């Protein structure tokens, strides 16, 4: 019988195999769309994953920083460094953490704090949402964000998170996008417990409109 971890790895392996063999072909990649649900920490094994680096990147996002690419590239391991080299220098612009903490007109809207406040006041709220996508600012971003919407739901005392991505590099990006999502669930669970709500971590559902594997990265996947 497969344990939960093995089951997640098996399902992801099967989905990637189907993506490569049955997905739409493009001169540079194969692509499709999918949704995957995790009830335990998602270590997907499509690349080497550093929990410490995932924590550092999530901290960087939650801090609202977007000044340098160095923090984001700290997560890169040597075998996939070439995948991110086009974005390894220069500034990121107003993406990810900037949108999370300094969004809206004049950068005065803290979406993360707004979600925390809503959940603390009413854990069953259906309005615990933040986004990293502002169309009018995409042109100022070094690269547009891939995960774009985060939605928290508390059902039956369990803190769940839905992440929607416009685009997902299955080999390079998915392992960290899902692991950091799982960390967010635990951070929100701890926050709600601190404020007197009795909740436990629930599930992470990651949905992407365009899951893709770049042809030059197939050797990393194999």
Briefly describe each language-model feature range.
Residues 1-222:
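Terminal, non-catalytic protein-protein interaction segments that mediate quaternary/complex assembly
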């Amino acid at each position: 019988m497969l344990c939960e971890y093995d089951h997640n790895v098996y399902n992801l392996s099967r989905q990637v195999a189907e993506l490569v063999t049955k997905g739409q072909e493009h001169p540079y990649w194969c692509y499709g769309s999918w949704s995957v649900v995790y009830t335990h920490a998602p270590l997907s094994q499509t690349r080497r994953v550093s929990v410490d680096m995932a924590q550092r990147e999530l901290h960087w996002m939650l801090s609202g920083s977007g000044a340098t690419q160095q923090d984001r590239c700290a997560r890169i391991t040597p075998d996939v460094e070439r995948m991110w080299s086009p974005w390894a220098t220069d500034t990121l612009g107003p993406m990810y953490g900037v949108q999370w903490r300094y969004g809206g007109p004049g950068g005065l809207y803290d979406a993360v704090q707004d979600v925390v406040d809503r959940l603390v006041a009413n854990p069953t709220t259906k309005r615990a949402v933040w986004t990293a996508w502002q169309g009018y600012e995409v042109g100022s971003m070094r690269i547009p964000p891939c995960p774009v919407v985060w939605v928290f739901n508390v059902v039956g005392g369990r803190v769940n998170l839905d992440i929607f991505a416009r685009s997902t590099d299955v080999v390079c990006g998915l392992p960290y996008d899902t692991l950091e999502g799982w960390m967010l669930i635990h951070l929100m669970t701890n926050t709600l417990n601190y404020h007197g709500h009795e909740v436990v971590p629930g599930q992470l559902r990651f949905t992407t409109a365009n899951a893709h594997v770049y042809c030059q990265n197939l050797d990393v996947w194999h």
